[in-house]
Curated annotation (Swiss-Prot):
UniProt keywords, alphabetically: Cytoplasmic vesicle, Electron transport, Endoplasmic reticulum, Heme, Iron, Membrane, Metal-binding, Translocase, Transmembrane, Transmembrane helix, Transport
Enzyme class: translocase
Activity-pH dependence: Optimum pH is 6-7 for the electron donation reaction to monodehydroascorbate reaction. Optimum pH is around 6.5 for re-reduction reaction process of the oxidized heme with ascorbate.
Catalysed reactions, semicolon-separated: monodehydro-L-ascorbate radical(out) + L-ascorbate(in) = monodehydro-L-ascorbate radical(in) + L-ascorbate(out); Fe(3+)(out) + L-ascorbate(in) = monodehydro-L-ascorbate radical(in) + Fe(2+)(out) + H(+)
TM spans (from-to): 18-38, 47-67, 86-106, 123-143, 163-183, 187-207
Protein name: Transmembrane reductase CYB561D2
Length: 222
């Protein structure tokens, strides 16, 4: 027997709620896992994976889930209030990423090694630069009077698209980091595959949220 449209809608909404809740838990759990693994403070380098996972796994994921209609932790706030919280979380993510990038460059300098020559390093640098541009673009949405010639709807569309690309870049840098000698020397077997699934899962949830809640809606409008 075929399901009614209303039943399908309820099932789909329940699945999105469950996936959003999973994204919250996975983003936090992955960041804690990396922190335990890296033991921040044990060396200069130890702060790099902690800060980068905090930036691209936890803070950035939470910044985007703020707008989720099913799994936002800030439902009680107005749209404007959630937008400001989103910008604050994104700014914190950028600061953590900049600090993490700076510390690993300093670490490489102290060892006399080349830096930003691996795919992980290059992806990380690109993700940090993209995050900086994204935060700058967010100012135009917080204060649209600064860009009077640009329709607000188009600004939101560009910001959403760019933000999704930036998030995927951050996730890619995390995935490449998990292929590094430092990570693979400590995490092997099933644990490694489970760790890899974390940014993959959160990326899928964020892609679904942005596409369905904004990009797809804009595409079907005349």
């Amino acid at each position: 027997m075929a399901l009614s449209a209303e039943t399908e809608s309820h099932i789909y909404r329940a699945l999105r709620t469950a996936s959003g809740a999973a994204a919250h838990l996975v983003a936090l759990g992955f960041t804690i896992f990396v922190a335990v693994l890296a033991r921040p403070g044990s060396s200069l380098f130890s702060w790099h994976p902690v800060l980068m996972s905090l930036a691209f796994s936890f803070l950035m994921t939470e910044a985007l889930l703020v707008f989720s209609p099913e799994s936002s932790l800030l439902h009680s706030l107005s749209r404007k209030g959630r937008a400001r919280c989103h910008w604050v979380l994104q700014l914190l993510a950028l600061l953590c990423a900049l600090l993490g990038l700076g510390l690993v460059i300093l670490h490489k300098e102290q060892l006399g090694k080349a830096h930003l020559v691996t795919r992980h390093g290059q992806a990380g640098l690109l993700a940090v630069l993209w995050a900086g541009l994204q935060c700058s673009g967010g100012v135009g949405l917080l204060y649209p009077k600064l860009l009077p010639r640009w329709p607000l709807a188009k600004l939101k569309l560009y910001h959403a698209t760019s933000g999704l690309v930036g998030y995927l870049l951050g996730s890619a840098s995390l995935l490449l980091g998990m292929c590094s000698l430092w990570f693979t020397a400590s995490v092997t077997g099933a644990a490694w595959y489970l760790a890899v699934l974390c940014p993959v899962l959160t990326s899928l949830v964020i892609m679904n949220q942005v596409s369905n809640a904004y990009l797809y809606r804009k595409r079907i409008q005349p």
